[in-house]
Amino acid sequence: VEVRQLAQMNGHASFNEVFMTDAVVSRDDLVGEAGGGWKCAMTTLANERRSFDRARDVGARKGRQGKIFADLEEEFAIANEPYTWYPQRAGRVDLILQRAMETGAIKDPAQRQDIARLHIMAESAKWTGERAKAAAKAGKPQGPEGSLGKLAASNVARLAARVHTAICGNDALLTGPNSPKEGIIAEILVSTPAISIAGGTDEIQKNIIAERVMGLPKEPRVDDGPFRDVRRNTSGTTTKS
C-alpha cells in the first residue's frame, strides 16, 4: 500500500492518493457488512465532521494550564498542520478593512462599495449557516440552508480574493516576510478556488437547490444505480458482477 501526497498550488498537501498493489485483506478485517462500504464511508465522514467540532473545543481551551490541556493542544496542532491554510481559502474577510486603511484604499469610493458589499455577503452567508445548524440541532429534516450557505461561502471567497487584489495591487502576489501580511494575501489568492470544490462543488450545490427547492427535474444520469451493477471489463471480457 503506497500513499502519495498531492501537492496543491498553494504549496500545501492536505490530501493524498493511495495505491494498493496486490494487497490482500483478511476476512477478519472486514468492517461492517460485505457490500456495505457506502454506509461505512458515510459513517466515517459523519464522525470526521464531528471531529472538527471537537477541534474547535480544543482551540477554545488553548492556553489553559495542566498536562491534559497541553497534550490536547499538541495533538491538535499535529493533526491540524496540513490544514493551516483553511482560513485563507475562505477569503479572510477579517483582514480586508485593516488592509484598506493601511494602504489608503478606503478613500476610494468604488473600493469602499466593494468592501461593504463583501461584508454584507459574508454576514448573510454566516446567518444562513447558523440557520442550518439550528435546524439540525432541533432535529428538523435537512433543508436548502446548507447548500445555500455553501454556495454563498464560495461567492464570498471569490469576491474577497478580488478585493484583496484591488487593495494590495501587484504586491498581493508577493510571498515572504516583507510581503502583505507576510504572504497571507498571496496564499488567499491561490487557496480560495478550493472553497468552490471542497464539500461539494458549486455545481452540485446548484443542482441540489434546483431539485429540492425549486422542484426542477433531475438531470439524466447513466450511472443511476448500485455500484455493484456497473458493467466492468475483466481480462478483455465484459462481465456483470
Residue ranges and their predicted role:
Residues 21, 25-26, 46-51, 130, ...:
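Short, well-ordered loop/turn and helix-capping segments at boundaries between secondary-structure elements
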Residues 2, 17-19, 124, 196, ...:
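Structured core elements
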Residues 9, 35, 102, 137, ...:
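Short glycine/serine/threonine-biased micro-segments
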Residues 147-241:
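Alpha-helix capping/hinge segments and adjacent helical runs
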Residues 58-140, 151-152, 156-160:
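Extended amphipathic alpha-helical segments enriched in small hydrophobics
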Residues 12, 33, 37, 85, ...:
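Secondary-structure capping and boundary motifs in well-ordered enzyme cores
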Residues 1-92, 98, 217-241:
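FAD-binding core of flavoproteins
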